[in-house]
């Protein structure tokens, strides 16, 4: 599964997603999370007293892979039982809500999601740069 809003996917990532899915039945592109996450206080949304250690976090994106039969059965169950599909069609969260263990595959920081003007500027910089510099 891949979305067209991430056009800079490379062969190494695709190969690892396929390999991990062949071994375990699914694969989710991921990277370590390098920012700090703080939990908003219930008393005051402009404050915090709690953080989530970044070592416990992974950033996930597309591509992702699932064995077709398992994915089809999961969607049928999710719609039938209204599980994991509340306002979202994101496959990974649905699968976790259904109790599935997800397996991480290699990701890439260059696999950016084009949603803002800044993303487009970064995309333009990547595609106008020398391919040997960044397409590795």
What are these model-derived regions, one by one?
Residues 1-5:
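Short beta-strand-to-loop acidic/aromatic patch adjacent to the donor-nucleotide binding site
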Residues 6-8, 112-113:
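Short, small-residue-enriched loops and turns at beta-alpha junctions
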Residues 8-105, 136:
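Conserved core of the sugar-phosphate nucleotidyltransferase
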Residues 32-35, 109-110, 118:
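Glycine-rich beta-alpha junction loops
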Residues 90-91, 109-113:
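Short linear loop/turn motifs
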Residues 101, 108, 125:
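Glycine-rich phosphate/pyrophosphate-binding loop and the adjoining helix
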Residues 111-136:
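Hydrophobic helical membrane-anchoring modules
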């Amino acid at each position: 599964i891949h979305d067209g809003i991430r056009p800079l996917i490379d062969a190494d990532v695709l190969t690892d997603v396929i390999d991990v899915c062949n071994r375990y039945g699914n694969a989710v592109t991921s990277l370590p999370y390098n920012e700090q996450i703080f939990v908003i206080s219930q008393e005051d949304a402009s404050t915090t007293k709690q953080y989530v250690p970044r070592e416990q976090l992974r950033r996930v994106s597309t591509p992702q892979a699932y064995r077709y039969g398992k994915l089809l059965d999961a969607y049928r169950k999710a719609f039938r039982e209204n599980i994991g599909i509340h306002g979202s069609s994101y496959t990974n969260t649905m699968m976790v809500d259904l109790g599935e263990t997800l397996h991480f595959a290699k990701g890439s920081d260059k696999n950016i999601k084009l949603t803002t003007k800044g993303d487009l500027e970064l995309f333009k910089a990547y595609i106008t740069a020398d391919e040997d510099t960044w397409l590795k």
